[in-house]
């Protein structure tokens, strides 16, 4: 086999072809494109890594056995074979292939692919701890983008586990154990939302340093003034200078620490917003989309609580259906404890073409297509008044985290109204007053709605 590398480490999709120059239908990527920035899943297809297979290893031929002689195996072949096995539902055999690939001195790209797909196998089998260990190695040693983990539907069940929450927190804090790429992305978004924070922190640090230097020269003068004698500086004046310097240092350091605290809080909120944007929904046409794909199109209203409470709120909302639809409201009911296994988790890597079509964010540049008038019109036509959650456990975890951050007891009945740009507009205990919401939210064709996008 020949491997054609490209500048981008995370943009690579294995493809099999019957010869070196003719391609056939694309298979599931080793890794989804991981270099997309947060809150923007737009992808650049200018550079890829392609894996070419000779005619002896074409799709029609049977995959090599894991017990084949080592001389005939390469890490690349094992990864491709593992993907084929996963497509056929043989997760255990696929796991063996990825482990074999790691034992064959793989290059960094093959190592990244093997560890990532091995983690997906563990996640499929419910082995959260092993999945975290593989992902941590890929993040730390092989430059895996954390956005890849957030975007991959094969890891939907894993993202609902407490192990993922721990991994996400580690990635947010950064460090040698997990790498800093996710934290760097968060900092970039934080700077966009608070563009002058970096400038303020610089001046706080500079003023504190200046006061410290001044204090360094003031201390000897203060000692000399206290001792007195000929030529000693005025004690009152020197004490005043020292007090000003100390006060300046305290104030500047306090402001610097306050800005750091606000930045950390903002990055936590950005992390939650990013997690929310990747939660899947099933529209009335049975099409599965991520919440981020509905931006600028609807205002999701999440209703979380006991089944009776949510059902009653949905019935009341139906009385204001026309007004709410004019305002782009999409109801998303989440019933506590209703954990159904979604289809996309069962299918794993080998999702059928029908499933792949229903989730256009996998393996195709959805955002670019969605910008076209035709695609947007089609999506709007599929959106009705209500959507069904996919991976309810993942939705519950996000809502409970949001409740904790807002000081609400986890498990209480709550509602969360999102803006057109995907951020939280407001939230509250209990269920919303639909008449009030109809007055509060502007119609979709209103100027205020255009400014909200």
Swiss-Prot record:
Q: Which InterPro entries match?
A: LPA1-like, TPR-like_helical_dom_sf, TPR_rpt
| Localization in the cell | Plastid, Chloroplast thylakoid membrane
Q: Which UniProt keywords apply?
A: Chloroplast, Membrane, Plastid, Repeat, Thylakoid, TPR repeat, Transit peptide, Transmembrane, Transmembrane helix
Report which superkingdom the organism of origin falls in. Eukaryota
Q: Does the keyword Ribosomal protein apply?
A: no
What does the UniProt entry report for the null mutant? Pale-green phenotype and greatly reduced growth. Disturbed thylakoid membrane systems.
First and last residue of the signal peptide: none
Annotated TPR repeat ranges? 75-108, 112-145
Q: Where is the transit peptide?
A: 1-92
What are the recorded Gene Ontology BP terms? photosystem II oxygen evolving complex assembly
Q: Where are the transmembrane segments?
A: 202-222, 238-258
Please report the record's description of how this protein sits within the membrane: Multi-pass membrane protein
Q: What GO cellular component entries does it have?
A: chloroplast; chloroplast thylakoid membrane; extracellular region
In the UniProt entry for this protein, what further remark is given in the free-text comments? Accumulates even in dark-grown seedlings.
Subunit structure, per the record?
Interacts with psbA, but not with psbD, petB, ALB3, LPA2 or LPA3. Is not a component of the PSII complex.
Q: What does this protein do?
A: Chaperone required for efficient photosystem II (PSII) assembly. Binds to psbA during de novo biogenesis of PSII.
Query: What name does UniProt use for this protein?
Result: Protein LOW PSII ACCUMULATION 1, chloroplastic
What organism is the protein native to?
Arabidopsis thaliana (Mouse-ear cress)
Gene designation: LPA1
């Amino acid at each position: 086999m020949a491997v054609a590398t490209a500048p981008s480490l995370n943009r690579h999709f294995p493809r099999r072809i019957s010869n070196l120059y003719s391609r056939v239908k694309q298979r599931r990527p080793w890794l989804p494109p991981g270099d997309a920035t947060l809150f923007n899943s737009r992808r650049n297809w200018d550079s890829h890594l392609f894996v070419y297979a000779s005619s002896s290893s074409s799709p029609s031929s049977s995959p090599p056995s894991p017990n084949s002689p080592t001389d005939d195996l390469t890490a690349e072949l094992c990864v491709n074979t593992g993907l084929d096995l996963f497509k056929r539902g043989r997760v255990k055999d696929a796991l063996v292939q990825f482990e074999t690939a790691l034992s064959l001195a793989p290059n960094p790209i093959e190592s990244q692919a093997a560890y990532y797909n091995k983690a997906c196998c563990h996640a499929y089998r419910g082995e959260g701890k092993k999945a975290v260990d593989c992902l941590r190695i890929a993040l730390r040693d092989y430059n895996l983008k954390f956005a890849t983990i957030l975007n991959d539907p094969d890891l939907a069940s894993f993202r609902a586990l407490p192990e993922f929450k721990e991994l996400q927190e580690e990635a947010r804090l950064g460090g040698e154990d997990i790498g800093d790429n996710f934290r760097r992305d968060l900092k970039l978004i934080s700077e966009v939302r608070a563009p002058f924070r970096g400038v303020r922190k610089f001046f706080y640090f500079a003023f504190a340093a200046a006061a410290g230097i001044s204090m360094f020269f003031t201390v000897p003068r203060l000692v000399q003034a206290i001792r007195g004698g000929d030529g000693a500086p005025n004690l009152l004046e020197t004490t005043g200078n020292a007090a000003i310097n100390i006060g300046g240092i305290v104030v500047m350091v306090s402001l610097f620490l306050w800005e750091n605290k606000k930045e950390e809080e903002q990055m936590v909120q950005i992390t939650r917003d990013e997690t929310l944007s990747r939660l899947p929904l099933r529209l009335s046409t049975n099409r599965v989309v991520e919440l981020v794909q509905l931006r600028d199109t609807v205002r999701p209203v999440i209703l979380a609580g006991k089944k009776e409470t949510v059902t009653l709120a949905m019935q009341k909302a139906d009385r204001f259906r026309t007004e709410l639809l004019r305002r782009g409201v999409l109801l998303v009911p989440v019933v506590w404890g209703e954990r159904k296994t979604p289809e996309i988790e069962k299918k794993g890597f080998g999702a059928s073409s029908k499933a792949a079509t229903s989730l256009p964010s996998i393996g195709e540049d959805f955002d670019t297509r969605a910008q076209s008038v035709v695609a947007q019109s089609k999506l709007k036509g599929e959106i009705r008044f209500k959507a069904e959650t996919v991976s309810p456990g993942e939705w519950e975890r996000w809502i409970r985290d949001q409740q904790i951050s807002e000081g609400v007891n986890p498990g209480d009945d709550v509602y969360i109204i999102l803006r057109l740009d995907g951020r939280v507009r407001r939230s509250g205990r209990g269920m919303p007053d639909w008449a009030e919401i109809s007055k509060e939210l502007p119609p979709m064709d209103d100027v205020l709605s255009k400014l909200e996008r």
